[in-house]
């Protein structure tokens, strides 16, 4: 097992980078994971992409729900490890897993039982699109427990300064997904052509393998996981502490997804092709925010451990070091999407009537990528401090602003592009406001 990285002693930039690089690579792999799905599904046509886009919103919603356990668990474990209390860290981790298992089972049951009314929310027009969306939802969200566990394992390994298991496990999952996608979607060799359903099955199989690999790495760990006893009675005090710390981030993520679903419903008013554009565009755009989110996770653990050790000077220096890496990446993504939207979008969808909408999406959202990277990294810094309210307040307020702004802008000649502008403008504002708020916070300390 890879030795954990010492985050509370030694050179700041090198230790932060050593922790962050595997996480960022893991995020890029996850992005590739999703993009490969989109490339293969895109070959079935924009209708298939629209099906996955609608059902995928509930997978996105599930990520907000698991944040309730993941955020509180990661911060408390990191803080306990930084303070030298690995026994406490083990209790927090056990409680985190218990909460996650409960949430995963309940969410899976809801998505399976109510799959049809959940898809009906989007007012899709094609019966085949609706049926495919229901099938995709029942499989991916019905078995969401594997996705939940993988996120918790990633957070806890990162909290103790060991980001390699997540990278290795996710890499194997990507390879499996690459192999299974064409086999199950198009029916190559002895496999039946399952189309959208095949993509869902390939995703779940890959996630199950990733979970098994995480269990193997956990069995080899001597820092945290041998202190975890899942069969012990739930610790209500620690569950309450995890809940209180994770709730603001959870609410922010759930509200964000709820708003995104409302926006998707507005987009659906322009046809199923517009839904496909939003789904593909969001996947392409993830080259920026998923990478930043990976680095933010490293910043979270770095700050949590140093906060537990009482080393405030390293916290400030660590945040500045993180920005030196994340902001150039955000700028690169801005240039990429604004200057080269056409060849990028054509990788996924080649239908001539859909491409202009895709180009518009990428160019408009491209302007916000730098600020989105700034927001995500700063949010990770706040959460590492145990202060989850500022990112939540900023995120919820400005995300809510997207709906009236989208309604106002779509009433102008911008039409569908007005929705894209509402997303881009609010992302820019979130980055600027949260950055200023964090500067004020650290000056007070």
Residue ranges and their predicted role:
Residues 1-20, 77-143, 191-247, 303-368, ...:
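Short alpha-helical transmembrane segments in multi-pass integral membrane proteins
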Residues 9, 13-32, 36, 58-65, ...:
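Residue-level signal for short hydrophobic patches within transmembrane helices
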Residues 18-37, 139, 173, 206-210, ...:
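Transmembrane helical elements of multi-pass membrane transporters/channels
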Residues 28, 32-50, 119-127, 185-194, ...:
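Helix-terminus/linker motif at the lipid-water interface of multi-pass membrane proteins
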Residues 30, 34-37, 41, 63-70, ...:
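Alpha-helical transmembrane segments and their lipid-water interface positions
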Residues 41-60, 92, 127-132, 196-197, ...:
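Interfacial/gating helices of multi-pass transporter permease domains
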Residues 49-109, 147-166, 264, 277-335, ...:
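Small-residue-rich hydrophobic transmembrane alpha-helices
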Residues 70, 140-158, 166-174, 199-214, ...:
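Short runs within selected transmembrane alpha-helices of multi-pass transporters and secretion channels
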């Amino acid at each position: 097992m890879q030795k954990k990285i010492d985050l509370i002693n030694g050179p700041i930039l090198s230790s932060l980078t050593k922790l962050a690089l595997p996480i960022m690579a893991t995020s890029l792999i996850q992005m590739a994971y999703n993009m490969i799905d989109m490339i293969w599904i895109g070959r079935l046509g924009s209708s298939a992409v629209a099906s996955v886009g609608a059902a995928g919103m509930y997978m996105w919603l599930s990520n907000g729900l698991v944040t309730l356990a993941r955020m509180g668990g990661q911060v408390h474990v990191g803080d306990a490890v930084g303070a030298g209390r690995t026994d406490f860290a083990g209790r927090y981790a056990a409680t985190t897993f218990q909460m996650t298992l409960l949430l995963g089972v309940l969410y899976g049951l809801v998505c399976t039982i109510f799959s049809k009314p959940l898809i009906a929310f989007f007012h899709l027009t094609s019966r085949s699109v609706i049926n495919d969306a229901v099938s995709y939802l029942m499989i991916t969200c019905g078995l969401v427990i594997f996705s939940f566990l993988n996120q918790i394992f990633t957070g806890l390994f990162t909290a103790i300064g060991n980001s390699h298991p997540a990278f290795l496990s996710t890499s194997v999952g990507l390879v499996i997904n690459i192999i299974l996608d064409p086999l199950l979607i198009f029916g190559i060799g002895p496999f039946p052509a399952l189309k959208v359903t095949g993509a869902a099955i390939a995703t779940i199989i890959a996630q199950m393998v990733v979970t098994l690999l995480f269990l193997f790495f956990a069995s080899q760990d001597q820092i945290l996981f041998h202190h975890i006893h899942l069969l012990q009675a739930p610790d209500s005090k620690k569950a309450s502490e995890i809940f209180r710390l994770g709730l603001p981030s959870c609410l922010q993520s759930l509200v964000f997804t709820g708003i995104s679903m409302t926006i998707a419903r507005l987009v659906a008013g322009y046809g199923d092709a517009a839904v496909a554009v939003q789904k593909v565009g969001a996947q392409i755009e993830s080259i920026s925010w998923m990478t930043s989110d990976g680095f933010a996770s490293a910043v979270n653990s770095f700050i949590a451990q140093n906060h537990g050790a009482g080393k405030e000077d390293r916290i400030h220096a660590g945040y500045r070091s993180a920005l030196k890496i994340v902001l150039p990446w955000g700028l690169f993504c801005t240039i990429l999407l604004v200057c080269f939207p056409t060849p990028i979008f054509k990788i996924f969808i080649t239908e001539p009537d859909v491409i202009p909408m895709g180009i518009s999406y990428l160019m408009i959202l491209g302007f916000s990528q730098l600020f989105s990277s700034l927001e995500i990294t700063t949010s990770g810094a706040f959460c590492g401090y145990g202060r989850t309210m500022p990112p939540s307040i900023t995120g919820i307020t400005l995300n809510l602003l997207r709906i009236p702004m989208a309604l106002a802008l779509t009433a102008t000649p911008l039409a569908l592009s007005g929705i894209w502008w509402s997303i881009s403008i609010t992302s820019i504002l979130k980055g600027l406001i949260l950055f200023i708020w964090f500067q004020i916070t650290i000056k007070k300390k």
